[in-house]
From Swiss-Prot:
Enzyme class: isomerase
Interaction with DNA: region residues: 186-191
Start and end residues of each Toprim domain: 2-135
Region (Disordered): 691-711
Function: Releases the supercoiling and torsional tension of DNA, which is introduced during the DNA replication and transcription, by transiently cleaving and rejoining one strand of the DNA duplex. Introduces a single-strand break via transesterification at a target site in duplex DNA. The scissile phosphodiester is attacked by the catalytic tyrosine of the enzyme, resulting in the formation of a DNA-(5'-phosphotyrosyl)-enzyme intermediate and the expulsion of a 3'-OH DNA strand. The free DNA strand then undergoes passage around the unbroken strand, thus removing DNA supercoils.
Every Topo IA-type catalytic domain range: 152-580
Marked site: Interaction with DNA: 60, 167, 175, 307
Family under the similarity heading: Belongs to the type IA topoisomerase family.
Pfam families: Topoisom_bac (PF01131), Toprim (PF01751)
Cross-referenced SMART domains: TOP1Ac, TOP1Bc, TOPRIM
PANTHER family: DNA TOPOISOMERASE 3-ALPHA (PTHR11390:SF21), PROKARYOTIC DNA TOPOISOMERASE (PTHR11390)
Protein's UniProt name: DNA topoisomerase 3
Active site, UniProt feature: 305
């Protein structure tokens, strides 16, 4: 009898097979005399569509809503049905005694496996592999500590409840809004509050009125002292009067105080923090960061599990620090890492906290030493950031003297503040940081002359527009960005982790871009006209971050066995009925403000011009038509003159590439450029390798250009 191991992806199945020496390769699985390891391809089973309940529901009609099945059905996904049949046969095989679930250790990973097992009708015992990295050592250790699968039943119930609730709310709200207003409109329990978050920030900026204020400083022996005051001066004349009082008056040093202080490194990375920093440093979006991180985790095995919301490690990891540090010696941080090899680490360090780790600990390097030449440019940047943060967390604090010099002149107090570094500590890892010395020439009681006075004019600034990084953080902590009637609501939002989860937020932002509810202009995210109208037409409850946080709180309670999934689903059904009735009875109107005179080639109706993340697109106004045409999109092809990215207009042989500098070239010229760059003929293998580069080439212009080449 054998144990069947079910992994989430083929790559993880191969890693498990390698770690456990399961060497016999079969069609869709690996096998030895103890184990069989097979895989899903992400989800193999999903929720049925409305028309799979009733073929009459294929056509969207307002009168058919709400669609609330008595029992939710699941179906096998067509394009991966072959692998499902393989997995099913193995589950039902008489030589298989039990199932080891080895999908991702989290809510969604549990759902992937359980939907398959339920669809097959499995009755065999379950065990669970729960690991945070897929290195050989981690897998082998995990198999020595397999858990009883029943321990994760509540996790599955929470995952299933989330999936079914999203289906019930999303299908009905989207169909109701679309059929009511004859427009492609979409609602969801996470996406709609996110639009509201962006809209609230946009309104704050639009309503902001700048105010002028003034500050006064004195220069003494080359050092600038600032006027100490509890108020902001909006009247320049007040400061000018103070300056007049200071003329021909000497000052006196009232005190020179030195206080020794320490600063500590930032927390280890969770996914949201890492995505935010990648955008801040390199303008790499959250989705691209997650994909790159997944590659570092699965393919290279040099970092731990990506989809974590924790900034801490568990105390049982203390003894693994040295081997992880050893792995980082392959990086440019080897000189900073080397002294840490002789340091003793304790579970009392602030980075170790069992109470602040739920499913997975913070993202840190594994014990696998990377082959740096194997990493892409983006993978290298991301890995370096993780290593930098990890090493900083293990280093000593940064120490400095905070010096405050207080000056009195004509009854007014001025202050000079300087920080003098005494111990670099963790800041030694960053270039440009060094020990500083301040030869401040002041002593208490000194009489000093004022060499210059300076009144500076300032202006208050509005809050910044969200970018892809800061929007993620706002989704995690929406209570910091919206006004709430009751403080307990802020606590609810904080406890539940805000809108969405670390695993879903990047996808939500991406979806909002694709549905033209939000747009990015020069890195500033704004709500489109369509997004604003969605907020106006949607039921108010569905636009509130608080509501989705309360739902998430209940899902967490289900996960902990403290709330019934059935109760939650019934609440979602009642909520959906109210939403649909509200939309049906609404007398509001939807207006296309981007309607063009271009006729749809499929149905003849006028098309709508929409902005996408990378350009513009024409979309048929009829939701049932679904015809789309690219108008323009930014590509990764570079201008031969100024090296900026070219924008593609049109498609096929008629396509034209244009640059902001004025350069323009036809598709034929681009083809020729590609040929000469590749020394003539381009092989299929070379082209496939080029197109698969993990460097954000999702909208690669050469997909169109190269298909016309005679390869």
């Amino acid at each position: 009898m054998k144990s069947l191991i079910l992994a989430e992806k083929p790559s993880v199945a191969r890693d498990i097979a390698d770690a456990l020496q399961i060497n016999q390769k079969r069609n869709g699985y690996f096998e030895n005399n103890q184990y069989i390891v097979t895989w899903a391809l992400g989800h193999l089973v999903t929720n049925a569509t409305p028309e799979q309940y009733d073929k009459n529901l294929k056509e969207w009609r307002l009168e058919d809503l709400p669609i609330i099945p008595k029992y939710m059905k699941t179906v096998v996904i067509g394009k991966t049905s072959k692998q499902f049949k393989t997995v099913k046969a193995l589950i039902l095989d008489n030589k298989v005694k039990d199932i080891i679930i080895a999908t991702d250790a989290g809510r969604e990973g549990e759902l992937v496996a359980r939907l398959i097992l339920d669809k097959v009708g499995n009755k065999k015992p379950l065990r669970r592999l729960w690991i945070s990295s897929v290195t050989k050592k981690a897998i082998q250790q995990g198999f020595k500590n397999l858990k009883d699968g029943r321990q994760y039943n509540d996790l599955y119930y929470a995952a299933l409840a989330r999936s079914e609730a999203d289906w019930i709310v999303g299908i009905n709200a989207t169909r109701a809004l679309t059929t009511k207003y004859d427009a492609q409109l979409s609602l969801g329990r996470v996406q709609t509050p996110t639009i509201q978050l962006v809209n609230t920030r946009q309104q704050e900026i639009n309503q902001f009125k700048p105010q002028q204020y003034y500050t006064l400083s004195l220069t003494v022996k080359g050092f600038d002292f600032q006027l100490e005051s509890n108020q902001r001066y909006t009247n320049k004349e007040t400061l000018e009067q103070i300056v007049n009082n200071l003329k021909n008056v000497d000052g006196k040093i009232k005190s020179v105080a030195t206080k020794h202080k320490k600063s500590y490194p930032q927390s280890l990375y969770n996914l949201t923090d890492l995505q935010q920093d990648m955008y801040r440093r390199y303008k790499i979006g959250p989705k691209e960061t997650l994909n790159t991180l997944q590659s570092l985790y699965e393919r290279h095995k040099v970092v731990t599990y990506p989809r974590t919301d924790s900034n801490y490690l568990t105390t049982d990891m203390v003894d693994t620090m040295k081997e992880r540090i050893q792995a980082t010696m392959a990086t440019t941080y080897k000189d900073q890492a080397r002294p840490l090899m002789s340091k003793t680490f304790s579970s009392k360090m602030s980075i170790f906290n069992n109470q602040k780790v739920s499913d997975h600990h913070a993202i840190i390097p594994t014990e696998v030493r990377p082959v740096m030449s194997d990493l892409s440019n983006r993978e290298l940047k991301l890995y370096d950031m993780i290593v930098e943060r990890f090493l900083e967390a293990l280093m000593s604090p940064h120490e400095y003297d905070a010096i405050t010099v207080t000056l009195e002149v004509a009854g007014h107090t001025f202050v000079l503040k300087e920080n003098v570094t005494t111990v670099l500590g963790f800041k030694s890892i960053r270039q440009g940081e060094s020990i500083t010395e301040m030869q401040q020439p002041f002593s208490e009681g000194d009489e000093v002359k004022i060499s210059k006075t300076n009144i500076r004019e300032h202006e208050t600034t509005p809050p910044e527009y969200f970018n892809e990084g800061s929007l993620l953080k706002a989704m995690e902590n929406p209570q910091n960005f919206i006004q709430l009637k009751d403080k307990k609501y802020a606590q609810t939002l904080k406890q539940t982790g805000g809108i969405g989860t670390v695993a879903t937020r990047a996808d939500i932002i991406d979806k909002l871009f694709n549905m033209n509810a939000i747009e990015s202009r020069d890195g500033k995210i704004k709500v489109t006209s369509k997004g604003k109208q969605i907020l106006e037409l949607a039921p108010e409850e569905l636009t509130s971050p608080l509501l989705t946080a309360q739902w998430e709180e209940k899902l967490l309670l289900i996960e902990r066995g403290k709330y019934q999934a059935k109760t939650f689903i019934n609440e979602m059904k009642d909520f959906t009925k109210d939403v649909v009735n509200g939309i049906k009875n609404s007398d509001r109107k939807y207006k296309h403000d981007n309607l063009t005179t271009t006729e749809c080639p499929t149905c003849g109706k006028f098309m709508i011009k929409v902005k996408t993340k990378n350009g513009q697109m024409l979309v048929c106004q009829d939701p049932s038509c679904k015809t789309k045409k690219n108008v323009q999109r930014k590509t990764n092809a570079r201008c031969p003159n100024c090296k900026k990215k070219l924008t593609l207009f049109g498609k096929g042989k008629e396509a034209v590439y244009r640059c902001v500098c004025g350069h323009s070239e036809t598709q034929a010229h681009m083809d020729q450029r590609m040929k000469s760059k590749s020394s003539g003929k381009v092989s299929r293998k070379e082209m496939k390798k080029y197109m698969n580069k993990n460097e954000g080439l999702d909208n690669n212009p050469f997909k169109d250009a190269l298909k016309n080449l005679n390869l």
